Amino acid sequence: MEKTVNPFRIGIAPISWVNDDIPGLGDHYTQDQVLSEMAELGYVATEMGRLFSQDPPSLRAKLNQYGIELASKFIGVLFSDRSRLEEELKTFRSWAEYLHDMGCKYAIVCEMGGSMHWDPRRAPEEKTIQRLTDSEWESLVDGLHRAAHICQELGMKLVYHFHAGTVVETAEEIDRLMELTDPNLVHLLYDTGHALYGGYDPVELLHRYADRIQYVHLKDVRHDVLELVRREQLDFRTAVLRGMFTVPGDGCIDFVPIFAKLIEMDYNGWIIVEAEQDPAVAHPYTYAKMAKEYIDRLVHHLLAAQKR
């Protein structure tokens, strides 16, 4: 096959091997196996996962061994709870400083208040989303702006990750967040799979907020499973275990207009394949290989078409 030249910086999250949201999935994988497979497939970056050391020198040495960079880490926050805001910002600063020490330029932030699975104030059996009040939105925005200033002090950018099962999930909520936040402070992490899950056409979202997107997560969606999840109102973890997400090229999302727009934008941030599945069902190496080959092939064809 003709070798493709991909101008994008493509990484992959360890969640394909070891799941951070669902304990027990992929526990048998070691960081050496995961990193070696990433490197073998041509990925150049990853994100923080629970299988990696949290000691910067140790992690840096391990990543360097395989020629992999750390792109960022998902940081769950409770900025919507005004009573916890100061403590949350202290915790955020410690993680931001950690990422800075690791050479990262981005901090991924997601509000956990009111979420299905990740709000520590709620009981585990509470699997509905508790939507934010106006005052909670105000606190969230305040926290994001202050956290973004911390990032700026460190030469980093804050990117907000809208996410299924959280209070910034739907098209209306994503638009509200973008409207309420300062575009010079709060940037957007564009996630194709979570956009579709939340009812936002991924192409429309990309075009609408192209000037605010600084980080990309690529995942695909199995349409039949998404319909089942909506019909039966399944919670997020159950949806993942049912196989709602998969890698780009294996689901119903059309990535041609997405990559065409990224090329038009001269996008130069990270693109991370982040497609959580049960590794016992979807073999991580096989699916990571499938994703990389699909992306390389698609980008090659789009760039070749430009030259005609």
Swiss-Prot record:
Name what cofactor the protein needs: glutathione; Co(2+); Mn(2+)
- Give its E.C. classification number: 4.2.1.44
| Enzyme class of the recorded protein, top EC level | lyase
GO molecular function terms listed in the Swiss-Prot or TrEMBL record:
manganese ion binding; myo-inosose-2 dehydratase activity
Q: Which reaction does it catalyse?
A: scyllo-inosose = 3D-3,5/4-trihydroxycyclohexane-1,2-dione + H2O
| Matching InterPro entries | IolE, IolE/MocC, IolE/XylAMocC-like, Xyl_isomerase-like_sf, Xyl_isomerase-like_TIM-brl
Q: Which keywords, in A-to-Z order, does the entry hold?
A: Cobalt, Lyase, Manganese
Q: Name one GO biological process term.
A: inositol catabolic process
Record-stated family: Belongs to the IolE/MocC family.
Instruction: Tell me the protein's name.
Output: Inosose dehydratase
Organism encoding this protein:
Geobacillus kaustophilus (strain HTA426)
Question: What is the gene called?
Answer: iolE
